[in-house]
Amino acid sequence: GSVVSHEYGPRNNLPAYICIPNMPNEFAGSGYLSSSYAPFSLGADPANQDFRVQDLNLPNGVDEARFARRRDALSSVNEYFSTRHNADSVTAMDSFYERAYSLISSEKARVAFDIEQEDAAMRDRYGRHEAGQRLLLARRLVEAGARFVTLTYGGWDMHTYITNGFRAS
């Protein structure tokens, strides 16, 4: 996922690499690439009734106007340092923040992550359990433009008592 993110970048204001519900282990991270190519983790499970993507909305107490003022202030500080110092880290963080701003301000991204927008019958067809809702959200994100989506769903890799294990799940 990180290689895809590095080579192709984001599309339609969506992160290039997304992990549902979270990054499962260090092998799903950015490896030797910059952390800016690491996956975007939802921070919540789409199978939960109160599912909400962790960092998709503005924090409580921050409206659009306050958000814009903060962004302008950060831009001024970054401009000051980048013109007076050799600040590669400022440039790198600036691109990271730009992607975050694009995600937060994109209605299309919010719709893609909002599994409640999906038809109830379709949600039922996928199954209202971890596997079904994670797969459904992955499909929505790919259709909206995410380049690489991975999801975690454990408990199916059985080595003993396979028949009974599958019946139980």
Spell out what each predicted region is.
Residues 1-169:
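Ligand-binding pockets and gating/stacking loops
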